[in-house]
Structure formats: structure tokens, C-alpha cells
Amino acid sequence: EYILFDDCYMSTVEVAYDLKNVTNHLIASTCEIMAYGMPYAKIGQYLIGEINYEKICNGFDDFYSNYEMPCGTIAVTDCAELDHLAAIMKDINSQYTFDTTLTGSLQRLDGYSPVIFFDCGDYVSKLCSNQELLAQFNEQLNRTVPFKRNTEYFYSMSRGKVKIETFS
């Protein structure tokens, strides 16, 4: 039914696409996850039996919003939707080339230098100027990632707290 990663940087479109034929859903963080890891005492009941992805995300967010270092992101990816997302991305990529001067304006999701993890929706919003195609992408992204939550900041061991302006 699902794979839950209690690890950093596993909620990326690349990871999801690689595993799309292995599982129905991925539950993971886009960023570094605090040493405490997944708050199983809060979300465990939603992981067993009748899975409730929304409550998993809400429980994670509730826990980390009140944690000593209130930083965290979680997302659920519906792997059945990934081919549709890839088809729209193929269309966008065939029409547009990313202006690398905009790289610094993208929502970073890591502490690396140079940055290697960005918010996918933010990237596409700066790549695609066709509003109709961008709307199609965003609608499909919302179907592909139906549940997600984030605190105001994410934590990076190398940068400390980093503000989250966009989380898709």
C-alpha cells in the first residue's frame, strides 16, 4: 500500500517516479528530518489498518509545530498519478528552458551549496509562462501530492532554520 521513509530528502518527484511501480503511495519528507524522526506515537494509528494519509500529515505537522525545533515537511505522493504528471512535464519541458538566473529565487529545500533540492511547483511556476499549461500542471500536482504539511521553517544542519515560502 505505501512506503514510509523516515529519512531525509525522500519526498522528491525523482524518488517517487523510480518507485511508482513498487507502491501505491509514498510518505516522506522533502527536507532534512529532525533526529526524532517520524512521530510514530502520534501517527502510528493512521499507518495501520485503514490508512489515513491526511491524519498522518496532520499528526506530523502537529508534532513538529510544537517540537523544540519546530521544523518539518511531510508529503504523501499518489504513485498512480505520476505518469500524468510526467506527461505534463514533458510538454512543459519541450516548450520551455529554465532561466538559470532565476535559480536563486526558487524555494530551496536543502542546506547544500549549491542547492540541489527545490520545490517542484515553484520551479515549474518559474519555468512555464503559459498560464493554462501551468494550471494543468498545478491541478495534476495536487492530484499527485494530495496531502502535505509543512512548518514555517525547515531545518538544515548546515544552514539552521530556513523559511518555507512555497511548499507544493
What are these regions (language model features)?
Residues 1-168:
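Terminal, contiguous helix-loop blocks that mediate binding/assembly
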